Amino acid sequence: MLSWGYFLFLLPTLPGAQSQVQLVESGGDVRKPGDSLRLSCKGSGFTFSNYWLGWVRQAPGKALNGSLPLTPLAAAPTYIPGVSGRFTISRDNARALLHLDMSDLRPEDTGRYHCER
Protein backbone atom coordinates (compact mmCIF):
# COMPACT_ATOMS: atom_id res chain seq x y z
CA MET A 1 0.00 0.00 0.00
CA LEU A 2 1.33 3.43 -0.91
CA SER A 3 1.80 6.04 1.76
CA TRP A 4 0.36 9.49 1.08
CA GLY A 5 3.58 10.87 2.54
CA TYR A 6 5.53 9.54 -0.45
CA PHE A 7 5.88 12.14 -3.19
CA LEU A 8 6.92 11.69 -6.79
CA PHE A 9 9.37 14.17 -8.23
CA LEU A 10 8.61 14.59 -11.92
CA LEU A 11 10.73 17.33 -13.37
CA PRO A 12 11.53 18.37 -16.89
CA THR A 13 15.15 19.15 -17.64
CA LEU A 14 16.56 22.57 -18.28
CA PRO A 15 16.44 23.76 -21.87
CA GLY A 16 19.31 22.63 -24.04
CA ALA A 17 20.46 23.71 -27.43
CA GLN A 18 22.51 22.32 -30.27
CA SER A 19 23.22 25.20 -32.57
CA GLN A 20 19.82 26.86 -33.05
CA VAL A 21 17.81 23.70 -32.36
CA GLN A 22 15.98 23.88 -29.03
CA LEU A 23 13.69 21.56 -27.09
CA VAL A 24 12.26 23.19 -23.99
CA GLU A 25 10.36 21.03 -21.51
CA SER A 26 7.71 22.35 -19.12
CA GLY A 27 5.07 21.11 -16.73
CA GLY A 28 7.20 19.35 -14.12
CA ASP A 29 5.80 19.15 -10.63
CA VAL A 30 5.79 17.11 -7.42
CA ARG A 31 2.82 14.73 -7.33
CA LYS A 32 1.45 12.02 -5.05
CA PRO A 33 0.96 8.41 -6.14
CA GLY A 34 -2.26 8.08 -8.12
CA ASP A 35 -2.14 11.66 -9.43
CA SER A 36 -1.84 12.74 -13.07
CA LEU A 37 0.56 15.13 -14.79
CA ARG A 38 1.19 16.53 -18.28
CA LEU A 39 4.68 17.41 -19.52
CA SER A 40 5.15 19.42 -22.70
CA CYS A 41 8.10 19.97 -25.00
CA LYS A 42 8.31 22.98 -27.34
CA GLY A 43 10.59 22.60 -30.34
CA SER A 44 12.20 25.42 -32.31
CA GLY A 45 14.94 25.88 -34.88
CA PHE A 46 13.90 22.88 -36.99
CA THR A 47 10.88 21.59 -38.90
CA PHE A 48 9.09 19.86 -36.03
CA SER A 49 6.89 17.61 -38.18
CA ASN A 50 9.93 16.13 -39.98
CA TYR A 51 11.41 14.47 -36.87
CA TRP A 52 10.71 11.57 -34.60
CA LEU A 53 10.53 12.81 -31.04
CA GLY A 54 10.36 10.97 -27.77
CA TRP A 55 10.69 11.12 -24.01
CA VAL A 56 13.44 9.57 -21.93
CA ARG A 57 13.21 9.09 -18.17
CA GLN A 58 16.27 9.54 -15.95
CA ALA A 59 15.68 7.80 -12.63
CA PRO A 60 17.21 9.37 -9.49
CA GLY A 61 20.89 8.52 -9.14
CA LYS A 62 21.06 6.95 -12.61
CA ALA A 63 22.91 8.19 -15.66
CA LEU A 64 20.76 9.40 -18.53
CA ASN A 65 22.40 7.00 -20.95
CA GLY A 66 21.21 4.14 -18.78
CA SER A 67 17.59 5.21 -18.89
CA LEU A 68 14.82 3.74 -21.00
CA PRO A 69 13.23 5.57 -23.89
CA LEU A 70 9.49 5.90 -23.51
CA THR A 71 8.99 6.01 -27.26
CA PRO A 72 10.21 7.45 -30.49
CA LEU A 73 7.00 9.00 -31.74
CA ALA A 74 5.95 7.83 -35.17
CA ALA A 75 2.49 6.93 -36.44
CA ALA A 76 1.77 4.71 -33.43
CA PRO A 77 3.86 5.19 -30.28
CA THR A 78 5.22 2.20 -28.42
CA TYR A 79 5.73 2.33 -24.67
CA ILE A 80 8.14 0.68 -22.28
CA PRO A 81 6.69 -1.96 -19.94
CA GLY A 82 5.02 -0.53 -16.87
CA VAL A 83 3.71 2.67 -18.45
CA SER A 84 1.42 1.31 -21.18
CA GLY A 85 -2.16 2.33 -20.43
CA ARG A 86 -1.01 5.04 -18.01
CA PHE A 87 1.24 7.21 -20.22
CA THR A 88 0.15 8.74 -23.52
CA ILE A 89 2.37 10.65 -25.93
CA SER A 90 0.83 13.07 -28.41
CA ARG A 91 2.11 15.83 -30.65
CA ASP A 92 0.81 19.05 -32.16
CA ASN A 93 2.93 19.72 -35.24
CA ALA A 94 1.26 23.08 -35.95
CA ARG A 95 2.40 24.39 -32.55
CA ALA A 96 5.64 22.34 -32.44
CA LEU A 97 4.62 20.65 -29.19
CA LEU A 98 5.13 17.13 -27.86
CA HIS A 99 3.10 16.09 -24.81
CA LEU A 100 3.47 13.32 -22.26
CA ASP A 101 0.28 12.67 -20.28
CA MET A 102 0.87 10.51 -17.21
CA SER A 103 -1.90 9.10 -15.03
CA ASP A 104 -2.05 6.83 -11.99
CA LEU A 105 1.50 7.86 -11.08
CA ARG A 106 3.63 5.36 -9.17
CA PRO A 107 6.83 5.76 -7.14
CA GLU A 108 8.82 4.11 -9.94
CA ASP A 109 7.76 6.94 -12.29
CA THR A 110 9.94 9.36 -10.30
CA GLY A 111 12.67 11.03 -12.31
CA ARG A 112 13.63 13.68 -14.82
CA TYR A 113 11.91 13.45 -18.16
CA HIS A 114 13.85 14.58 -21.22
CA CYS A 115 12.38 15.35 -24.61
CA GLU A 116 14.68 14.14 -27.38
CA ARG A 117 14.86 14.47 -31.14
From Swiss-Prot:
Region (Complementarity-determining-1): 50-54
Annotated signal sequence range: 1-19
SMART domains: IGv (SM00406)
GO cellular-component term (any): immunoglobulin complex
Framework-2: annotated span: 55-68
Record keywords: Adaptive immunity, Disulfide bond, Immunity, Immunoglobulin, Signal
Pfam families given in the database record: V-set (PF07686)
Residues passing through the membrane, by range: none
Source domain of life: Eukaryota
UniProt-listed GO biological process terms: adaptive immune response
Record-annotated disulphide pairs: 41-115
Region annotation (Framework-3) ranges: 86-117
Segments for region (Framework-1): 20-49
Region of interest (Complementarity-determining-2), ranges: 69-85
Protein name: Ig heavy chain V region E1
Gene symbol of the encoding locus: E1
